[in-house]
From Swiss-Prot:
Origin: domain of life: Bacteria
Residues engaged in binding DNA: R230, Q406
Record's catalysed reaction(s): cyclobutadipyrimidine (in DNA) = 2 pyrimidine residues (in DNA)
Keywords linked to the UniProt accession: Chromophore, DNA damage, DNA repair, DNA-binding, FAD, Flavoprotein, Lyase
Source organism of the structure: Agrobacterium fabrum (strain C58 / ATCC 33970) (Agrobacterium tumefaciens (strain C58))
Gene name per UniProt: phrA
Protein name: Deoxyribodipyrimidine photo-lyase
Null mutant phenotype: Cells lacking this gene show an attenuated photoreactivation after treatment with UV-B irradiation.
Site feature: Electron transfer via tryptophanyl radical: W308, W361, W384
Similarity comment: family membership: Belongs to the DNA photolyase class-3 family.
Cofactor(s) in the UniProt record: FAD; (6R)-5,10-methylene-5,6,7,8-tetrahydrofolate
GO biological process, one term: photoreactive repair
Root EC class: lyase
């Protein structure tokens, strides 16, 4: 084969889209046949159950989009190097392209593989597609990484505008013979019995089309009033883009540019607030890039001396949404029912696990990793450490959310609680976030029997707060 006609392998990873996919566009511009491949890597470890559900549907959507453009998606599982070498041998490809990833395992794999393939005379090119800017690009005046969000935001805001999103290729050149592909159904990514994901499709449509639809809906609706509305879980006031960004079904650059030119009918503070959330995701990846053990070790190592409790009974009650605190239970049940949780409530339930129950943040991070459709190695780790007080630019440990007051402030009418904790549906408004304070007649009228139809609190807020502060004080003494 001549250089001009040799196939190019496009290795899809966290970029399951055709639009604004710089690796795919480079393959098309190469001029030869394009062979898209997705590898279920052995070295990457297992995905969480919710992410597996998402991946199945996202790969199906990507496969359909590629077929419409004249291509197809080759699926393979195992060792990435072996699979790519087999594909190169089978197809005669002389070039491999991919979009960069920034988790520690992925970066190590890519670095080693790129060098090995280049040593064999192959062309290997990587592109930016997961973030607005490379995490190594922004540096403090002293040349180091940022550790505080606000200066990071200012630096990014003052840097070059993210690239304008590229259109998808109109067509793909197919090879004369397609390499063998595994069947997606054989990967068994979907739950069977029980089908705990049966309600996911009520709110989620994985894939690039679903991502673009979510973005359009948000721009036309919830972006207006976002700054205030985003904190109220009963309102449809958030973008719901996080799982699409996590899977790479839409690029952050596309989201960023979609908010341009809207100031005539949407307040600038709403646009700025939303962009800051996009940049917070960037900040999380900046931290993970410079501190690869973010998901395993405390950023602030003084927390290594913290005396966590081994309380499996309380942890189980938390995971099941049976703590006796309605706002916490509503969040945990939303997580199980829809694979997501409102951001404000994520902070509340994380604070409750860490500070009310004194359970290690890493247990919570692992649970979220298994149950969130938008589980992300950078955001998940950084946000849990932020709540714990052990992370970069973290909320101080002594900031302990009162789950009753948080519920009353952000779910005043109890609509969120009533939706996900239906056993409290008929309880009157003033008791919806503290059923344990309701008089017997109010409970009876609502059909609530504490300890039977709904649990009593597994911990007293006041006592838990005192215990948490004492544990924190003990750490301060030893550091």
């Amino acid at each position: 084969m001549s250089l001009k006609t040799a196939p190019v392998i496009v290795w899809f990873r966290k970029d399951l889209r055709l639009s604004d996919n710089l690796a795919l566009l480079a393959a098309v511009e190469h001029g030869g046949p394009v062979i898209p491949v997705y590898i279920r890597e052995k070295s990457a470890g297992p995905l969480g159950g919710a992410q597996e559900w998402w991946l199945h549907h996202s790969l199906a959507a990507l496969s359909s989009s590629l077929e419409k453009a004249g291509g197809r998606l080759v699926l393979a599982s195992g060792d990435a190097e072996r699979i790519l070498r087999d594909l190169i041998s089978e197809t005669g490809a002389d070039t491999v392209v991919w979009n960069r990833r920034y988790d520690p395992t992925g970066m190590a794999t890519d670095k080693a593989l790129k060098q090995k393939l280049r040593d064999d005379g192959l062309t290997v090119r990587s592109f930016s597609g997961q973030l607005l800017h490379e995490p190594s690009r922004l540096q403090t005046k002293s040349g180091g990484p940022y550790r505080v969000y606000t200066p990071f935001w200012r630096a990014l805001e003052g840097s070059d505008e993210p690239h304008a999103p590229a259109d998808p290729p109109k067509s793909l050149t197919a090879p004369k013979v397609w390499p063998k592909s595994e069947k997606l159904s054989n990967w068994k990514l979907l739950p069977t019995k029980p089908d705990w994901a049966k309600d996911f499709s009520d709110i989620w449509t994985p894939g690039e089309t679903g991502a673009l639809d979510k973005l359009d809906d948000f721009i036309d609706g919830a972006l207006k009033g976002y700054e205030e509305g985003r904190d109220f879980p009963a309102k449809p006031a958030t973008s719901l883009l996080s799982p699409h960004l996590a899977a790479g079904e839409i690029s952050p650059a596309a989201v960023w540019h979609a908010t341009k030119g809207l100031s005539r009918h949407i307040a600038s503070n709403d646009i700025s607030r939303f962009r800051k959330e996009i940049v917070w995701r960037e900040f999380c990846y900046h931290l993970l890039f410079h501190f690869p053990e973010l998901g395993e070790k405390n950023w602030n190592d003084s927390f290594d001396a913290f005396s966590w409790r081994d309380d499996e009974k309380s942890f189980k009650a938390w995971t099941r949404g049976m703590t006796g605190y309605p706002i916490v239970d509503a969040g945990m049940r939303q997580l199980w029912q829809h694979g997501t949780m409102h951001n404000r409530v994520r902070m509340i339930v994380a604070s409750f696990l860490i500070k009310h129950l004194l359970i290690d943040w890493r247990k919570g991070e692992k649970w979220f990793r298994d149950t969130l459709v938008d589980a992300d190695p950078a955001s998940n780790a950084a946000n849990w450490q932020w709540v714990a007080g052990s992370g970069a630019d973290a909320s101080p440990f002594f900031r302990i959310f009162n789950p009753i007051l948080q519920g009353e402030k952000f779910d005043g009418d109890g609509d969120y609680v009533r939706r996900f904790v239906p056993e409290l549906e008929k309880l009157e408004r003033k008791y919806i976030h503290k059923p344990f304070e309701a008089p017997k007649d109010a409970l009876k009228k609502a059909g609530v029997e504490l300890g039977k139809t709904y649990p009593l609190p597994i911990v007293d807020h006041g006592k838990a707060r005192e215990r948490a502060l004492a544990a924190y004080a003990a750490v301060k003494k030893t550091t």
